[in-house]
């Protein structure tokens, strides 16, 4: 039996609690900043008959079940070093949640922020999400709408890291882990490889598009006149190239199809479950953790002691 050496009435415990709660409040405000910034483009989404990125997330997940967002502070004070204006998340919403009863890795381009443009931190975050999917054998569901690489912040490292993302997709395919992609909007340049390397692709009529170059770049490079829809619209890919397996009427319909695809995988059919072992409740309250950990990196702390079980099973 471990006995905690933490004195919850000590000045240091009170200081730690106060400082850690302040940090949590700050983080939540920053996450709300990201959500509000994305929400500013709601009028544009509505004009296109689209759902916003967070509405897509809500429609995809099973109601009432938990969603664990991962790496939500990625990119903060990196591309924009000003803490008063910097937006965390790297234009990407990622995490683990339940889709049609199946635990999945969720990967959503936040096209409400810089049109979902990709930076180095976006790719680094994406690579970590892919590693999570591979390690835990989680089906990957990617809701795509991105302007591609941010060429205004060009760095050669971006392309090297991007290649790592494609390698990760190939490894997932080799492992038999399903990849489901929904084309909600643009997916150009390197972004077009994502649906190309997926097992199931759902494209939204009129809005979904995947091509190595959009119409404007094609015109600038060759002088040829075309449209995004003719170059790589969802209709073209569903009827001619074969990239798109399912053609959806709108975002809501596309996500309904994605949920049906995940359900049809039978991913958990051979999983018999694990019986929970009997255990006694912890001797110490989990509320003590926040006051046990100092905010500076110099002070020591008894990390394990407050969370030890009161006895019985492990």
What are these regions (language model features)?
Residues 144-270:
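Conserved catalytic cores of soluble enzyme domains
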Residues 93-110, 125-152:
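A structural preference for short, pocket-lining loop segments at secondary-structure junctions
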Residues 114-120, 154-157:
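Flexible beta-alpha connector loops of hexameric P-loop NTPases
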Residues 1-93:
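N-terminal amphipathic, basic-rich helices that act as targeting or association modules
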Residues 13, 49-52, 106, 145, ...:
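Hydrophobic/aromatic residues within transmembrane alpha-helices
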Residues 86-90, 116-128:
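Glycine-rich anion/phosphate-binding loops
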Residues 301-307:
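Conserved small/polar residues in nucleotide/adenosyl-binding loops
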Residues 250-296:
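Terminal amphipathic helices with adjacent charged low-complexity linkers/tails
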